[in-house]
Amino acid sequence: MLDYLIVGSGLAGISFAEVAIKNNKSILLIDNKSQHSSRVAGGLYNPVILKRFSEVWNAKEQLVLMNDFYDRVEDKLQVKFNFKMPILRKFFSIEEQNNWFAASDKINLEPFLSTKLITKKYTSIDSPYDYGEVLHTGYVNTALLLEKYEQYLLENNLLLEEAFDSKDIEFLDSGIQYKNIQARHIIFAEGFGMHKNPFFNYLPLDGTKGELFIIKAPDLNLDLIVNTSVFILPMGDSLFKVGATYNWHDKTDAPTEEGKQELLDRIKEIITCDFEIVKHFGGVRPTVADRRPLLGTHEVYKSLHILNGLGTRGVMLGPALAQALYDHIENQIPIPQEADIKRFHKRYLKSLISDQPSGRKK
């Protein structure tokens, strides 16, 4: 019997897989790649919410676990995909500068916000009010990470490339059977695909579509990330990733004319040089209304667990949440209250009246 059957091979799925493997547990992943958000993610990690000058939930702990996780995976796969790089916030007024300095005085933000103005001028970026520097930042090349991790899984017969059908779950006394696979636990790490999961679709996952560009701008001489209303991330060879939009209504992955226009307008607010769009792509982020993840065990079926709702911060959240869920399952350590799906217990009770599956017992 397997220890863990993991549904989904995005950031959440591989984060849990890696934690399980590190603890000598047997795993198998199932994924048909119907969800794209991890693969097209910007990949930035940043401990500060720059719009509101507030600390990301549990940022210090997440950064430690994240760096340990990516160091280990880079070592294992012999590939570099975690790039530590400063993020500069471009200021548009003296007032924005003042807000920055006020925020950097706060005890929880002090480790993350530099108190020195960055006055350096970058070719093709107009910056009369200079920049503030966020510390402990960078980006993960998520597409490369997922591609190489998938190769590793396939080489070790740890990945089934097929759609998962929850109708085929049968419940055993000490786990589940799925088709010809027996496992102690299932981890659902499906991203926005959770809406089709009859065991957890009562949870308020509200996908937010994001669109991004890769642009070519030979005259933009930038070796760090600039963040304003969008981020500009250097990829080498005069290529830059730019994003992202937020659309709460469109739940498709397809790039749109509306998203394209919004990105074009925002880029032109920041850079003054010519550029061409090399690629335009989109994905639906798994976001939750209260901006907290979805982590926990099903109220009735104790072999079913969820790891979802990583939203816009998957590269930072994934490793820490995977560890928290693993510790909960194996060592009965309580899940942080803010992330535990028990906060939606009333929604679960309401769902019992409608469509929660009864489950088959073998």
How should these model regions be labeled?
Residues 1-12:
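Beta1/beta-strand and adjacent pyrophosphate-binding region of the FAD-binding site
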Residues 5-7, 181-193, 322:
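Short hydrophobic core segments
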Residues 44-123:
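Dinucleotide-binding Rossmann-like beta1-alpha1 core, especially the glycine-rich loop
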Residues 51, 55, 79-89, 115-148, ...:
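Helix-loop-beta segment of a Rossmann-like dinucleotide-binding subdomain
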